[in-house]
Design a protein with these regions (language model features):
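Non-catalytic, soluble scaffold/interaction modules
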Residues: 1-110
Length: 110
């Protein structure tokens, strides 16, 4: 199965999904790709151990995109329905090696 979004930070990542909007929620596993609805700065504490980020909103200059480029992890923005469709524990694969702001697919399975 797959979803589509825009590349806001380049790179590749493969890990389990951690779906949350709560910056105080503890990740259930060490390696994860953060899936969130928004790009608010409050979610930042969860970024530094994430292998990648997927968000339903935002763009190249959103907070999550800027921070993800600084810490060199892939970030996909404008990924509609990702928060509802993806569940914590799903296996995700991001290949965001194309140019910034181009459309990219996100592969996932249960």
């Amino acid at each position: 199965m797959s979803l589509e979004g825009k590349i806001a930070s380049q790179g590749k990542a493969e890990a389990r999904a951690f779906v949350t909007n709560n910056p105080l929620e503890k990740p259930p596993f060490e390696d994860y790709i953060l899936v969130t609805q928004n790009s608010d700065p409050e979610i930042s504490p969860l970024l530094y151990n994430a292998k990648g980020i997927i968000t339903e909103v935002g763009g190249l200059m959103s907070h999550l995109a800027v921070v993800s480029r600084e810490i060199k992890i892939p970030c996909i923005t404008a990924c509609e329905n990702s928060y509802d469709e993806l569940k914590t524990g799903y296996n995700l694969k991001i290949d965001a090696t194309a140019k910034l702001n181009s459309r990219v697919g996100i592969e996932y399975d249960f």
